[in-house]
Amino acid sequence: MNKKIKLLGILMTVSFLCCYAQTKEFDPSLDPNVTIVSRQSQEEWNSRYMWYPGQLAAFYQQQCARISKERCVNVGYPGKFFAKNNHAWFRKEVRLKKESSLCWEGPSDIILYINGVKQSVSGKQVILSVGRSSLLFEVTTDDSLPCIILKGAGLENPDEWQVSMDKEHWTIPESAVMYNKPGVLPDAPQDMTARIKPSQILPMRNAEMQGKDGISIGKNGYVLIDFFHLEIGTLTFQAKGKGTITVRVGETPEEALERDDKKLEQYPLAPVTLSEEGGTITLPERALRYVSLECDKGAEITSLRFDASLWPVEHQMQFETDDDYVNNLFKMSSATLHTSMHRFYLDGVKRDFLPWSMDALVSTLAGDYLFGDQQVSKNGISIALMPLDPQKSDIGIPDYPLHALFGLKQNYLRFGDLTTSLQYKDRIIQLLDFYASIVDENGFVHGNYGDRQFGYTPGWSTYNGPVRKGVAAYAQIMLYYNYVTGAYFADLWKESALADRYRKLARNLKKKIFEHFWDDDRKVFINGTMNDNVTVDKRISHHAQYWGILADIFPKEHYDNLFENVLPNLPNYYEVVSYEKGYEFLAYAKAGRIKELWDHIYGVFGDWMDQGHTRFPENFMMNASRARQLVFYNRPYGLSLCHGANGVPVVVGALNGLIGFSQSSMKTNEYTIKPELLHLKWIHSRIPVKEGYIVLKLNAEGESTIDIPAGCTVRIIKKIGKKPLVLREQGGYSFRLKD
């Protein structure tokens, strides 16, 4: 078996090197060889479903947990989250100049009250009288999202309604434009189907190809099939023969050929009994790229296909260069995020199919530009924000809720929607006040909080620390960033006293961070303390440094020392790379270290692509053997080989690095383009912003062009120290990167 797998690896590597020499479509929705199955058309209204903020995420999370339990073998999920509720009320005061018809749709049990009087209606429609009326809808469900969609009487806009789960605390309903079909509830399946044919079929033993896609398998023979695209979906084929056929699936050939079911991350598929008459076989949903088929007595297989479930997206950001290798890295990254995009930006689709706070929110750094699906990002924000009235016992991973405000600010900057922060205002304030109440005398949050005491989890690249249950410097910097961001939103809400309170907490914490964790000799942050919370951990890791840059507290005068002397000399810094890299590479871009960023990308992400993979994994072990690369949690196939968070680094490297895109947080309609093309001759890109699209054609030599939408200002910085080109009017402009 080992010799065959080794030979198989050589054959596949050769084929992948050939196909990667030119641009490849890694996303099934863009692959011309993949068929997108048309969905049944549904009536659409000029309105959209609305629900209590965070409740769609709560029901979606429950769905993910159920899917995970049915399919995944090893699942752990520390922490308590915002609970689902089967009851909601929607209210609005109206004043009509003429009699009007109002229709609605939603779950079965919806009651309308007008001026406090319960209405007896049929057909989910009512005629509203002229004059003032107080409307109240009560929606009750058994086990689905309490929601409603309206049509008529000029009352369709969810932003003009209020929603409550208890008739006491009211807020702005949540909604999204994709949920505009009255016959499809928001928590109903939304995926589209991509029909994928095999990329390669390799007879392994006593098997041969029959025609283009037929397979003849003899007694105890088997074949290996590669679909190229790693997705979650169902396998279907026509089969006739005798005995049984055993189907094994995996993210790698090794996993798909594994005979020991105890080593698998997904429950094994039951053998299928064949008949000589033949028939269609459709197997339960699995995450896979590779499939092996083994027959004990022989079979004829035809019409093999993989029906992958894809979240419907619009590919908003575009990026292309003269270097196909860079293009493929970008496309593979985008596909990694899309594969992981089901209701949320998920953790590994094979191993657990669950949303986690850090994974979901670091993914928005790229996903918000690639796809612009604000609701998916908001779902991640909701699970990161703690449940109402949080307690210490609710904590799973102490630093994970601190990603929520990072995601909220990213969401506000990208979409320009203050409504989101207002919808989650109570939970934002409760989160910040909760953390302020559980810190020690220095204002520090500890890693041993929570019933399970899971500990800090900055990612898996912790060879240099910090320890899990001490006082980690990076977590305190995250808390500082949360206070600063809380003040930022309080200012937007025009609540000056609240903003001042958070600014004071931030000032005091920043002072303590430098007193306890700044190493003035080495000009970096140390890790913090060991698990006893007393012994100082003077080791240096990258986590506190990049959070320091993102939070604007790492001294800029020490950037050179950090990037030239400290980081390159950290043990295993380049050898063990994890899913926090999207954050860290954003810090690289912010510090202007574009060459170092891309050298890191080529060395890690490029190496993974060169090995023939089509998605990026949760963690990289650069010096490990092929078998060891797949091991995680001491399980032979425990590593997730498609992890949305690691689709982010290359996109950040392209958007914030090569293009040099950034946005002012104080004047949010002001953008900066600071290109650094490195070896590239040209870049063509379309960047979605809240005002529309910025379209760029950057040329290292000669004329470059830019088109900007109305309502924004774009600054183009061509050289350090030179006056920037400032563009304030909608239209197209030309310029040169070199004078």
Regions found by a protein language model. Name each.
Residues 362-371, 404-420, 477-496, 546-556, ...:
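Well-ordered alpha-helical scaffold segments within catalytic/enzyme domains
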